Amino acid sequence: MSQGDIIHFTSQALWLVLVLSMPPVLVAAVVGTLVSLVQALTQIQEQTLGFVIKLIAVVVTLFATASWLGNELHSFAEMTMMKIQGIR
């Protein structure tokens, strides 16, 4: 395994982490912005409200994308193990 292969696998792993973490982060950002807007418009100063709603939205997003996340991680791990096995 050359340095180029290691760099390629590392960049693929980092890209996979970025792509797989994007749905919960985007949902948390959008829901947080909407909750903040509603709180500003209604002058509600409850800080736990935004946290609870964001937490619920992120958990729902993780449940909704769990199959996709698992498939992507499994295929990446399988590909990596096949490449490592081919070194010998």
UniProtKB/Swiss-Prot annotation:
Disulfide feature: none
GO CC term (a single one): plasma membrane
Record organism: Yersinia pestis
First and last residue of the signal peptide: none
Protein name: Yop proteins translocation protein S
Record family assignment: Belongs to the FliQ/MopD/SpaQ family.
Transmembrane segments: 15-35, 49-69
Record key words, sorted: Cell membrane, Membrane, Plasmid, Protein transport, Transmembrane, Transmembrane helix, Transport, Virulence
GO biological process terms held by the UniProt record: bacterial-type flagellum assembly; protein secretion
Function statement: Component of the Yop secretion machinery.
Subcellular location: Cell membrane
Membrane topology, from the record: Multi-pass membrane protein
Domain of life, source organism: Bacteria
